[in-house]
Structures are given as structure tokens and as C-alpha cells.
Amino acid sequence: MHELSLCEGILQILEEQSRTQGFIQVHRVCLEIGALASVEPEALRFHFDVVTQGTLAEGSHLEIVTVPAQAWCLPCGEKVSVGQYFDACPQCGSRQLQVIAGEELRIQQLEVE
């Protein structure tokens, strides 16, 4: 249930940006979440609504964009899609993969006033 602490961190970022950028209300938050980030989107949405009550982000829409997991295969040099850590390369069968996408958790865009 680390989604609660993630939402608290997101709110902290929103409050800091509000002070530096001068906005007073958040209408929409768009997050990029990698497929390997171990984040449950529905739990994140639930906790976001709870954490933002009474704040500048209360009632804002949380949009989640899932980033597919991709890796680079060291032996064959191919960029491949993976479903989880330690998957084998679909091209050569090697497990020597370096993840290059899918671990993200970042605020991609805000709609504010």
C-alpha cells in the first residue's frame, strides 16, 4: 500500500510548484507510470482523492498513462518488450536484459489556474 505515500509525495510536489509557479488550483494531474513500477492504478486513484481533500488539488482529475516496459538485450542488441523483470529476450532467449523503459513514475502534465 505504498500508493498512499506516493500520493502524499505528489501532493507535496504540487504544493511546492504552486508556491514557485503561482497557481492556486489544480484541475488535472497526468502521471506517467511504468508497467514495472509496481503501482496499482486504482489504489493510486483512491488514495489521490483521499489525500487531496481540502487542498489545492481537491476534485482534480488524475490521469494515468502507462509506459510499456522495454529492455535492451546485451547479447543480440535488440530493443524488446518485456512483461516483467527477468523475462527472456524473445529474439535470442538471453536473460541479459537492461530495462530502458517501464520503471517511470513522474508527473507528465498539470492543468492549473
Swiss-Prot record:
Signal peptide: none annotated. It holds the Pfam family HypA. One of its GO terms (molecular function) is zinc ion binding. It comes from the Bacteria. Gene3D superfamilies: 3.30.2320.80. One of its GO terms (biological process) is protein modification process. Keywords: Metal-binding, Nickel, Zinc. Zn(2+) binds at C73, C76, C89, C92. InterPro entries: HypA/HybF (IPR000688). Ni(2+) binds at H2. Belongs to the HypA/HybF family. Involved in the maturation of [NiFe] hydrogenases. Required for nickel insertion into the metal center of the hydrogenase. NCBIfam families: hypA, PRK12380.1. PANTHER family: HYDROGENASE MATURATION FACTOR HYPA (PTHR34535:SF3). This is Hydrogenase maturation factor HypA.
